[in-house]
């Protein structure tokens, strides 16, 4: 068993990475940075200039903004400036009202918001907001993490400058993980230390159930529950996993004012990691202990993979999140560490290379593909089948497999990222 100090550090890591969020985290992070700049300014900004990394721009172009019925960055920036509260972090737009949305529309129409691509930076998650008004100027910068402020300044007076610090230093030091360490923590830590993870079950299941009752995005979650689809897929554990996961994503990408529990700065990852585990646990009458440990295993696997992949990349986040849920489902099927490792290898062999072309309603389709693969990979692992080291990017050591996956997503797909962004920004 891990020492108490090691467990405390891992629990603190989970609590940093698994947090509530309303709306897609990229435009919400921009709204958060704008809100902080406006707070520093001390008055309503007359002009807001926003400069973003390409990945932030890509992920914020086509997604709904909570409570607005609108898509994209301008309304997120406007509302961040007018009603955002930075203390709410990824729920910064919690207080949005119809009146505030109307104010935001006017703010945009008055050409008070300017959004540009930040040139000459290596950081994939970078947000810089300059707010001007009443003869004053304030600047806020977020980098490395969706809520990680690294620079604050008003009228030349710098109150925070951590631009040279790493994200790990900002978060109090990175916790070194391996898949076996993730497994050991999830399966041996005292249960009372892990019960907090059940909040992800409550929040994300509620998001899916609200989506079933409404019209959100492409309505994939509801479609999978229709009579025609039931005739094809049946009313099974598998079909329920797909419908719950896609429904929660439908609502989130459409901009519903519905909170979800995010993972590593992504709400969709926070949906795809635990919800398949929750549904499988409920449908198989798993004990609370089994459910808790499976949820921790899923969430912490995602956090581990993201440590080397980075917050944003050209690789769709559902690849990572569904790998976590596959681990959790394998555990609930009675799998041991070897079978969980096999499920991870099966996932990497299958989904590596799925591109991220921004946050948008059709993300629910990708999440559904990811979690369907998660179930298949778990079933293969439990049946004794695992992709072998002679096949493609798979190696005997599961941690090396994970590093191969993250190297492809972090480094190998950079040109893919540039091409995708070029296509998205030059559409007629």
Task: Identify the role of each PLM range.
Residues 1-11, 42-56, 236-255, 287-305, ...:
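Acidic-glycine-rich active-site phosphate/pyrophosphate-binding loop
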Residues 2, 6-41, 45:
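N-terminal signal-anchor module of multipass membrane proteins
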Residues 2, 22-25, 54-56, 144-147, ...:
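A structural signal for small-residue-enriched, beta-sheet-centric alpha/beta enzyme cores
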Residues 20-36, 258-275, 317-320:
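Conserved phosphate/anionic-ligand binding catalytic regions in large, soluble enzymes, centered on
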Residues 31-127:
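Early transmembrane hairpin of solute transport permeases
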Residues 38, 280-293, 303-369, 382-389:
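Hydrophobic alpha-helical bundle architecture
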Residues 44-48, 88-93, 114-116, 193-197, ...:
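Flexible, glycine/charged-enriched surface loops at secondary-structure junctions
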Residues 109-255, 422-428:
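Signature of multi-pass transmembrane helix bundles
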């Amino acid at each position: 068993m891990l020492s108490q100090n090691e467990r405390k550090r891992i629990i603190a890591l989970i609590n940093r990475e698994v947090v509530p969020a309303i709306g897609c985290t990229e435009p919400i992070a921009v709204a958060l940075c704008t809100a902080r700049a406006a707070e520093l300014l001390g008055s309503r900004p007359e002009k807001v200039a926003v400069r973003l990394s390409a990945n932030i721009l890509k992920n914020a172009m086509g997604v709904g903004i909570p409570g607005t019925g609108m898509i994209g960055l301008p309304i997120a920036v406007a509302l961040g400036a007018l009603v955002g509260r930075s203390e709410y972090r990824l729920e910064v737009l919690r207080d949005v009202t119809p009146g505030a949305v109307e104010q935001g529309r006017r703010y945009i129409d008055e050409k008070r918001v300017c959004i540009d691509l930040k040139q000459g930076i290596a950081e994939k998650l970078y947000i810089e907001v300059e707010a001007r008004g009443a003869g004053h100027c304030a600047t806020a910068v977020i980098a490395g993490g969706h809520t990680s402020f690294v620079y604050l300044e008003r009228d030349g007076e710098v109150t925070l400058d951590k631009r040279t610090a790493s994200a790990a230093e900002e978060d109090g030091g990175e916790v070194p993980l391996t898949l076996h360490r993730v497994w050991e923590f999830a399966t041996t830590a005292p249960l009372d230390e892990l019960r907090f993870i059940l909040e992800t079950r409550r929040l994300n299941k509620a998001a899916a159930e609200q989506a079933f009752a409404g019209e959100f995005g492409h309505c994939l979650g509801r479609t999978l529950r229709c009579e025609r689809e039931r005739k094809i897929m049946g009313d099974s554990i598998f079909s329920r996993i797909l419908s719950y996961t896609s429904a929660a994503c439908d609502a989130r990408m459409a901009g519903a004012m519905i909170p979800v529990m995010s993972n590593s700065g992504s709400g969709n990852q926070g949906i795809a990691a635990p919800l398949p585990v929750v549904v499988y646990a409920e449908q198989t009458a798993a004990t609370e202990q089994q459910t808790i440990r499976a949820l921790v295993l899923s969430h912490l696997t995602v956090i581990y993979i993201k440590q080397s992949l980075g917050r944003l990349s050209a690789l769709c986040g559902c690849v990572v999140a569904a790998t976590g849920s596959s681990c959790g489902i394998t555990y609930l099927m009675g799998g041991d560490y070897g079978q969980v490792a096999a499920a991870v290898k099966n996932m990497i062999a299958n989904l590596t290379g799925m591109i991220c072309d921004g946050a948008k309603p059709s993300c629910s389709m990708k999440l559904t593909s990811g979690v369907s693969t998660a179930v298949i990979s778990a079933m293969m692992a439990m049946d004794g089948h695992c992709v072998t080291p002679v096949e493609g990017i798979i190696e005997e050591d599961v941690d090396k497999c994970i590093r191969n996956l993250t190297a492809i997503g972090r480094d190998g797909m950079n040109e893919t990222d540039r091409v995708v962004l070029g296509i998205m920004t030059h559409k007629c």
